[in-house]
């Protein structure tokens, strides 16, 4: 086991600070974060243009360097060398906690291997912020982050989360939201969901309902902003009065999904999931008529 005494005097190596930044509202930054950013020898940022806005707002003149997915190997080595030489580096992401859904994780691992102190400066986090306002269970949750861009890989990832009883937390971009909601309904079934948009910003919005309702909303809405999706875990079914397909025959049920853009095979699978019956039964009923 390696031991780190975070605030013990260290004269040899520097310190890597993981500094949380606001997820939208600049008033959410902490006094400690501002002090750390001012006192660091340099700030490593995912997008220097975005971080520069924050630094200018709080009159922070610390040297700013770029550290992102495409330069993480070369820049990561340079940052580690600086830390070994005794410099202090503050790592930030575009918004929220660094090392969450960004390459900061690799830098943390490298720093720990070199015996460099890694100190978190906590603050805003979109996932937890969305979760506590979702109305879904908070005692157990699993953070998934961004799903794969490709449909096949995205559906496979959702299949892997399907048995999870904990509340699920996803991030999604506006141009992929519709496809993601379609796949969630197909794979996970008609669970409760909270769609959180533009957290802490002027146009912050929460849409709470079922995945079926979310799919309908997304097909009609103009999708803008960054999204956090909080999805009910497996095992907590929608209340009986909310079973929207109860009045439909199996054939009408399949045709409903086809009208939403599902292929017949996908529609049959989803109907079987909704009704809790074998897929073969729905297939036979649908093709007999």
From Swiss-Prot:
MF annotations from Gene Ontology: rRNA (cytosine-2'-O-)-methyltransferase activity
Keywords associated with the record: Cytoplasm, Methyltransferase, rRNA processing, S-adenosyl-L-methionine, Transferase
Protein's UniProt keywords contain Cytoplasm: yes
Family matches, as SUPFAM superfamilies: Tetrapyrrole methylase (SSF53790)
This protein's record includes keyword S-adenosyl-L-methionine: yes
Localization (cell): Cytoplasm
InterPro entries in the record: 4pyrrol_Mease, 4pyrrol_Methylase_sf, 4pyrrole_Mease_sub1, 4pyrrole_Mease_sub2, rRNA_ssu_MeTfrase_I, SAM_MeTrfase_RsmI_CS
Entry EC number(s): 2.1.1.198
First-tier enzyme category under EC: transferase
Catalytic activity of the protein: cytidine(1402) in 16S rRNA + S-adenosyl-L-methionine = 2'-O-methylcytidine(1402) in 16S rRNA + S-adenosyl-L-homocysteine + H(+)
Gene3D superfamilies: Cobalt-precorrin-4 Transmethylase, Domain 1, Methyltransferase, Cobalt-precorrin-4 Transmethylase, Domain 2
Gene Ontology CC entries for this record: cytoplasm
Family to which the UniProt record says this protein belongs: Belongs to the methyltransferase superfamily. RsmI family.
Protein task: Catalyzes the 2'-O-methylation of the ribose of cytidine 1402 (C1402) in 16S rRNA.
Protein name (database record): Ribosomal RNA small subunit methyltransferase I
């Amino acid at each position: 086991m390696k031991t780190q005494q975070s605030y013990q005097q260290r004269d040899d190596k520097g310190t890597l600070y993981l500094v949380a930044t606001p997820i939208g509202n600049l008033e959410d930054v902490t006094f400690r974060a501002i002090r750390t950013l001012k006192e660091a020898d340099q700030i490593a940022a995912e997008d220097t243009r975005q971080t520069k806005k924050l630094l200018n707002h709080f009159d922070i003149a610390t040297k700013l360097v770029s550290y992102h997915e495409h330069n993480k190997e070369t820049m990561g080595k340079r940052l580690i060398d600086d830390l070994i030489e005794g410099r202090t580096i503050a790592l930030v992401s575009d918004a929220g906690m660094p090392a969450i859904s960004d390459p900061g994780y690799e830098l943390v691992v490298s720093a720990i291997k070199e015996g460099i102190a890694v100190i978190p400066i906590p603050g805003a986090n979109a996932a937890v912020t969305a979760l506590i306002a979702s109305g879904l269970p908070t005692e157990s949750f699993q953070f998934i982050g961004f799903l794969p861009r490709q449909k096949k890989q995205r559906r496979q990832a959702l299949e892997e989360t399907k048995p999870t009883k904990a509340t699920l937390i996803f991030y999604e971009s506006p141009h992929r939201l519709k496809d993601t909601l379609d796949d969630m309904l197909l794979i996970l079934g008609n669970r409760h969901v909270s769609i959180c948009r533009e957290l802490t910003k002027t146009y912050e919005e929460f849409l709470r309902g079922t995945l079926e309702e979310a799919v309908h909303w997304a097909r009609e809405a103009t999708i803008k902003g960054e999204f956090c999706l909080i999805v009910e875990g497996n095992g907590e079914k929608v209340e009986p009065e909310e079973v929207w397909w109860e009045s439909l025959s199996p054939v009408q049920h399949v045709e409903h999904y086809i009208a939403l853009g599902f292929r017949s095979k996908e529609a049959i699978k989803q109907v079987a999931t909704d009704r809790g019956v074998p897929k073969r039964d729905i297939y036979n009923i649908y093709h007999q008529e």
